């Protein structure tokens, strides 16, 4: 990618100061580095999680450090004759529920081959506590940790009464009776429709979560925590209390070898830490270069917008960058099939439509499949419908086909404080001031403007239905039955034709190889980081920027992003970020009406 290399050159003076000397991964006490043909325990270090996208902040992560890299590492480990066992380290975190379900299924394949799978966690979450029940033959919990497996619940915060006290008027509309996005601003509790949809989706997700535990006692305990380590052992959630070194020793004992190879995570063998070359390599996309026929995975994670920026943006999916990625893949002779990995609550309908359009063009040239992580909701599902086939995990959320939009009117509250405003329209026609300032927080909507906004939303909703119908090859009437803004679990979506198969990223890659007619052991590249970095920094492709410009842009971006995001509790950030298009001048969003995260 031409400008990706220029970006690396421009950033060189800046990042040389933060480069580190290349160091070998430290060996655990009792571990040895394996020779080429020696039997070994392969280790998965999940202490830093498994990010879906390459951009784990301002700099791109190596492709091997993404969730796709984790799936590939397991695929290779399963095929290797030298694998004698598996060690999984969680630390205090690990995986979200959709990832945990797929990785657990992959690890059971090692167990079926008679290979030990030893897992260690400093602390367990809902997702990892269920994971270890299914995936691990031996389960360790840190003596000072805890098992925070407490069951699943959703919390929605309602602000209607507070806004009333502050004299802030809420002008929000929605299309779809289940599209409850504005409800927290308009009501003090959920509508019957919102309660019905959320109860049904949570119940289905809960069923998939509990199904990870095969033993009845452990399954029951998943909803009874939090537990101290001794109580977690008593309830059958873990086998032993101990440190990571104890789990390492047990893995070596069961595998009958002291050789260990870290195949995933920040401690990957021979790749401990970043040096300057690795950062430049990642920025330029160099590690993804291969002329051999292969499958490309395109991670699309986060809120959807037309471009990077906005007060609450945390990166996410931008049509500005993603369209370039998809067009490049369409023209690549080496890329024989594409898997789009989606985890998004939605966002801009315009950006969603632009990406959908490129996927539809791409699938005319080569197979395009979608793999859903935590969710493909609203705008996320809009994009997913552009793929020929959609895979989703049992806990994935899909659907939410609907739109909402509006604004908060601050003028009554400001008037109470002695602040007044007056709009001077250029035209003196009746209603000109209301029309010209229809997105202003100082001008309330009149009936005519509200009617026009409602018509605008209905048009976007109708287009949303038509796009899903075209992409999924369904009648629009059938899509409407599952629309109205309602969310669905993946099993519910399968029954309704919204997805094609319950399965994870690995199944999607296998299918893509088959459809693309590439070998089963062919490479898998992870695409998408280099295209967006200059856009993120507000430096266009044609800018002649020097190191000073880039350094200033880096500082500007981080300061703006950090200040805004620090105002929002972490669990609400995905939803708030999906509203970024409203702050960028769009009147309507296609977004999940609340933050939905299962840990």
What are these regions (language model features)?
Residues 3, 7, 18-53, 59-70, ...:
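Intrinsically disordered, low-complexity segments enriched in small/flexible residues
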Residues 77, 81-93, 331-346:
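Short acidic, glycine-rich surface-loop motifs adjacent to enzyme active sites
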Residues 89-226, 342-482, 486-487, 514:
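Conserved catalytic cores of soluble enzyme domains
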Residues 137-138, 239-240, 337, 388-389, ...:
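Well-ordered beta-strand positions
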Residues 145, 243-245, 504-506:
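Beta->alpha turn/N-cap motifs
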Residues 221-242, 479-503:
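Active-site-proximal helix/loop microenvironment
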